[in-house]
Amino acid sequence: MSRDSLFVAGFVDISTCPKEDPSLNLDAQTWSRYLPLSTSIPLTVEHFSEAQVGWVTGLFSVAQGLFCTAVITAGEFLELLDSLYLECTVAQHSPKADLPRNPRAEVLHSWLPELSLSSVHPDLLGTKDEPGQVFHHISLCALGRRRGTVAVYGDSLAWVLSRFQSLSRDDVAMIATNALTPPSQAPEFTVKLGLLFAKAIDAGFISNRISTLKLDRQAAGISPATYLKASAVPQKLETAAPLNQPEGADTLIDSTMSGPGAPPAPQDDLIPVPRSAFLNMLESTVSRTHPANGDAPALLPFGRYNMVQVPKGLTPYVRPVGFIEPSDQDDYRYPSYTGPRPYDYFAPRQLCRNCCTSRPRKRAREDPEDEVSFPGEESTVFRKDLTDLSKSLAELQSEIRELKQMQNTPRPYPRPEHHYPAFDPLMYGLRPLPNPDKFPKEFICSDYFTKDESASKKPEVVHIPNPEQHVPACAAQPEVKLVEEKDVAPKQPRVVNASFQPKAETSKAATLQKLFCDEMLSKQ
């Protein structure tokens, strides 16, 4: 193992992988004219010219694409890798394969796992503006723009080339034979560490970086027996010893328990949710949930029986065993019809979301624009929401119990009956036709409308004053009788109408008749 160098190799372009930018396409026939390299080109970090860490010893055109080899010889950079290994948890994560520990290779696989080629734009090739040097440099980076450009680090070139299963034996032999010897000149690693830290921070916010590295590793055909950390997960080096539990005690703790006595959930299982959103989800869940032991389904109203159900009144009557009836009766009984009860027309009770279970919605919290959050730091707004949720947990549980009690309230169903009620034609939307034989022959009016008037109205007596002749009291009695007979004589019905007025002719005739009677009585 050499302490002064570290070898690296990998694809800088795979022809079968699609490119997002057309300028990233490398035509094998066009670029093969500038290969192989006549001299070594710089190997840098994140395309910083002052961050040169070694030399590129070869660029080779193979069946899959463009392959490169390089060597890291900068002493300052190698010392930086040794110091980073002592503080990096991911780098100290042991590889899955049975490989010896290599701190420098493990740090580079965790920090700079891919390669990036810097070359002339394809549009300038073959023109008068084509520069003399087509390939500028190759950089170690956190994630390349071309897919499949995964780097493999090792202590020897032969070991590094053996990790690529996509290379044939002829390609491996050709690369090992034609690789250049690095220059004896030491590379200039004078970059400020702040620039490297800034790039490392930016790499932490690349979307889907880990999954992309896994796909690039598969595209390059790299063997699992490498130090690549694309699928590594940070683990704690020290674990707390388990507490002593008595025999028979359950040592498993469910992290999803909730309540005052529940253990705290792990940090990875906590999802910050605003209070308004949590209440809305809880409300919709409770409204859709029906009690386990619900009431029986409601009875169907009249006129909604299907072909499977038996209509009321058409079920055969079964006589009880040992019961002797006084007379033979029909097999089918139709008890006396009783009017429908009020609850027969009630629809099935349903929970109204608008007026029963819905709670007054609170105004959703607006995200403050001036809220500043840093990577790895929990947001203040989410922390406040979690605190409020923990304080109001008892209130939410009480509300859930009240909603369940409302749903479990029994419905006022009628008591079961032993016999079906009588057949009701209205149940099928039919009305019984009247029997013409039972129609009355002549119109008979009831005294319902006139009994009050006849009881309250007294016989009307009209007295005609006669100053010339005195009428005795005994002689006035027939006059009253005549008036009563006149009023009672007609058999026609009388209807009290509030807007009706007596006819004037009737009053005049009664007056003349009375005058005639007075004349007859006076002559006797």
From Swiss-Prot:
<feature type="site" description="Cleavage; by assemblin; Release site">
    <location>
        <begin position="230"/>
        <end position="231"/>
    </location>
</feature>
<feature type="region of interest" description="Disordered">
    <location>
        <begin position="359"/>
        <end position="378"/>
    </location>
</feature>
<dbReference type="GO" id="GO:0006508">
    <property type="term" value="P:proteolysis"/>
</dbReference>
<dbReference type="GO" id="GO:0039708">
    <property type="term" value="P:nuclear capsid assembly"/>
</dbReference>
<feature type="short sequence motif" description="Nuclear localization signal">
    <location>
        <begin position="359"/>
        <end position="365"/>
    </location>
</feature>
<keyword id="KW-0118">Viral capsid assembly</keyword>
<dbReference type="GO" id="GO:0030430">
    <property type="term" value="C:host cell cytoplasm"/>
</dbReference>
<feature type="active site" description="Charge relay system">
    <location>
        <position position="116"/>
    </location>
</feature>
<keyword id="KW-1035">Host cytoplasm</keyword>
<feature type="site" description="Cleavage; by assemblin; Maturation site">
    <location>
        <begin position="498"/>
        <end position="499"/>
    </location>
</feature>
<feature type="region of interest" description="Interaction with pAP">
    <location>
        <begin position="268"/>
        <end position="287"/>
    </location>
</feature>
<protein>
    <recommendedName>
        <fullName>Capsid scaffolding protein</fullName>
        <ecNumber>3.4.21.97</ecNumber>
    </recommendedName>
</protein>
<dbReference type="InterPro" id="IPR001847">
    <property type="entry name" value="Peptidase_S21"/>
</dbReference>
<keyword id="KW-0597">Phosphoprotein</keyword>
<keyword id="KW-0720">Serine protease</keyword>
<keyword id="KW-1188">Viral release from host cell</keyword>
<dbReference type="GO" id="GO:0042802">
    <property type="term" value="F:identical protein binding"/>
</dbReference>
<feature type="active site" description="Charge relay system">
    <location>
        <position position="47"/>
    </location>
</feature>
<dbReference type="GO" id="GO:0019076">
    <property type="term" value="P:viral release from host cell"/>
</dbReference>
<dbReference type="GO" id="GO:0004252">
    <property type="term" value="F:serine-type endopeptidase activity"/>
</dbReference>
<dbReference type="InterPro" id="IPR035443">
    <property type="entry name" value="Herpes_virus_sf"/>
</dbReference>
<comment type="similarity">
    <text>Belongs to the herpesviridae capsid scaffolding protein family.</text>
</comment>
<keyword id="KW-0378">Hydrolase</keyword>
<dbReference type="GO" id="GO:0042025">
    <property type="term" value="C:host cell nucleus"/>
</dbReference>
<feature type="active site" description="Charge relay system">
    <location>
        <position position="137"/>
    </location>
</feature>
<feature type="region of interest" description="Interaction with major capsid protein">
    <location>
        <begin position="504"/>
        <end position="524"/>
    </location>
</feature>
<keyword id="KW-0645">Protease</keyword>
<keyword id="KW-1048">Host nucleus</keyword>
<dbReference type="Pfam" id="PF00716">
    <property type="entry name" value="Peptidase_S21"/>
</dbReference>
